[in-house]
Amino acid sequence: MDFNREHKINFLYVLAAMVGVLLIQSLVSQPDHIRTIPYSEFQQLASQGKVTDLVVGPTRITGTLKDAPKDSPRHFSTLRVDQALAQSLTNENVTFSGEPEPGPWPTILGWLMPIVGFALVWMFLIRPMSMGPGMDGMMSIGKSKARVYVEKDIKVTFADVAGVDEAKDELKEVVSFLRDPRSYGRLGARVPKGVLLVGPPGTGKTLLARAVAGEAGVAFFSISGSEFVEMFVGVGAARVRDLFEQARKHAPAIVFIDELDSLGRARGSAFPGGGGHDEKEQTLNQLLAELDGFDTSIGVVLLAATNRPEILDPALLRAGRFDRQVLVDRPDKKGRAQILEVHLKKIALAPGVPVDDIAALTPGFSGADLANLVNEAAILATRRHAENVSLDDFTQAIERIVAGLEKRNRLLNAHEREVVAHHEMGHALVAMTLPGVDMVQKISIIPHGIAALGYTIQRPTEERFLMDRAELMNRMAVLLGGRAAERLIFADVSTGAADDLAKASAIARSMVVRFGMDPTLGQVAYEPETTSALGLPNGSEWRPRQYGEQTAAAIDAAVRELIETASACAFSILQANRGLLESAARDLLAKETMSGEELQALLSQLGGGAASASVLRDGGDGAADAGQDRSGEHRALTVEGGEAQ
């Protein structure tokens, strides 16, 4: 944008307004109730005694006529030309007075005060409306709100981005194009007009876009998709045009649109019956038009980020617009270690802390989660006045993030503590008995978070993306282990297993209606995906079911049978190890927390797992895609806990 031209236009507006104010003042300042008369007429009136209340100045005389006509002004003014006037007035017995001629300041102030007043009005009212962030710019409402970062402002490079090597390799091509746009036309190649960064929240999409600008050393325009649309019709389209115009003037440059899904949602999807948001659609149409007329040879690249690619308009993703999609997924163990290396440089780390062990303890964590973990660990170390951050600080920080804050002021009575201890130990013993189940890392009966009265944390031993039928059944058995322990020891169940039961029911229903793992209903997908390709809730509108009442009853029966089978498995394991369950629960009551090493000492005393595992394998086979099921994203840390009511 030409800022000098904009300021020049504003100055012309102010100058024109000032001239108008001065003209109005000059017209108003000329009184129409004073009549100017010749000095000879004044002498004649004075000699006849028809004037009074004279004010005699060095150059002008003003006064009042005694008997003025009704349609004529009573006040008069004349220029003084007679130096012997005072003597003449005295001889005629006319009252008069003298007044010194005013200096130049009253006249100057009379002209300046309107100017100053208008300037103050412009500074405090008009200018904030056009420029201030608080009132969103009524005079610049059609201007883009993109924040511009010039080359020296971008301090982020690819060295600051870790754990997403594949995405960095894709974007390095964009950097080389920005450095030398003409080289890509040598063999007829065309650089993609738009690059769409797709990934779950917190994986570093915005950081990658800034790193591209930092590596290329070009201007970086950053704007959110929600900033285009306002309450006025046509504003969004105007801002899209202005954004691309600014980018062309600052070329080479990068235009980054964050949260593209708020702008590029599929047209006609605002209501199930059709229609849509006309203003958003108009803004999207303008964006599509700009992308069609976008000449990449000028050195401008459009980047965008979203975590909901499935709701974007197909016209936006076609070849020639956003024709390249770069997946920025949650990092694996190696990627997490690389991300931790970047963030650990900012804190005082104790010597000998194994980064790989921390990475192994954080499956499913995104880059933002890991940054938060390092900060939480540093806060915990500061709280205990330590010289540096130890591995124990990271372990406690993981527990705070996964299970929530400790609530030691939430006091339980003796019976409730026993129920919670047996509940959590039931989870742990079933998990340690069944094969292929994530290793138990820690159990606790200290209340955490909003509702958890205790928790059991499991940590996967490896990255997994597929789960077969037996593994899903084992997972349900672990979830129902706490409820089975309550039924075995106390001959009753409590409300603390409500969350476990809901999770087990969700797995069982997915096995029946999505994975086709029920032999009676067959290999049919009765319900669509409930999560997006990135493992997030797709937020789609309600869809009517595609099956009848008889099939619905069969589905309910199959789900119930799977849950009952898993519950029976957990109960049989705990019944075979009842003595161990009771003794381990007593230890847990005394210690309140038990680590994975302490639990491993109980492993040699366990029995009854093989028979129970064979029961779970009966009834069919199959595999579930954990990447699509997302019942455990990348086999993330699993937490089972009693729920407070």
UniProtKB/Swiss-Prot annotation:
Binding site for ATP: 199-206
CC annotations in GO: plasma membrane
Main location: membrane
Any one GO BP annotation for this protein: proteolysis
Entry superkingdom: Bacteria
SMART domains registered for this protein in UniProt: AAA
Required cofactor names: Zn(2+)
Record: residues binding Zn(2+): 423, 427, 500
Entry note: cofactor: Binds 1 zinc ion per subunit.
Coiled-coil region(s): none
Periplasmic side: 30-105
EC main group: hydrolase
Keywords associated with the record: ATP-binding, Cell inner membrane, Cell membrane, Hydrolase, Membrane, Metal-binding, Metalloprotease, Nucleotide-binding, Plasmid, Protease, Transmembrane, Transmembrane helix, Zinc
UniProt cross-references to PROSITE patterns, sorted A to Z: AAA (PS00674)
Chain ranges passing through the membrane: 9-29, 106-126
UniProt-annotated stretches for the region Disordered: 612-645
Database matches in Pfam families: AAA, AAA_lid_3, FtsH_ext, Peptidase_M41
Location in or out of the cell: Cell inner membrane
InterPro entries in alphabetical order: AAA+_ATPase (IPR003593), AAA_lid_3 (IPR041569), ATPase_AAA_core (IPR003959), ATPase_AAA_CS (IPR003960), FtsH (IPR005936), P-loop_NTPase (IPR027417), Pept_M41_FtsH_extracell (IPR011546), Peptidase_M41 (IPR000642)
Compositionally biased intervals (Basic and acidic residues): 627-637
Membrane topology annotation: Multi-pass membrane protein
Cytoplasmic topological domain: 1-8, 127-645
Family according to the record: In the central section; belongs to the AAA ATPase family.
Subunit structure: Homohexamer.
Function: Acts as a processive, ATP-dependent zinc metallopeptidase for both cytoplasmic and membrane proteins. Plays a role in the quality control of integral membrane proteins.
The protein, known as: ATP-dependent zinc metalloprotease FtsH
Native species: Paraburkholderia phymatum (strain DSM 17167 / CIP 108236 / LMG 21445 / STM815)
Lineage, top ranks: Bacteria, Pseudomonadati, Pseudomonadota, Betaproteobacteria, Burkholderiales
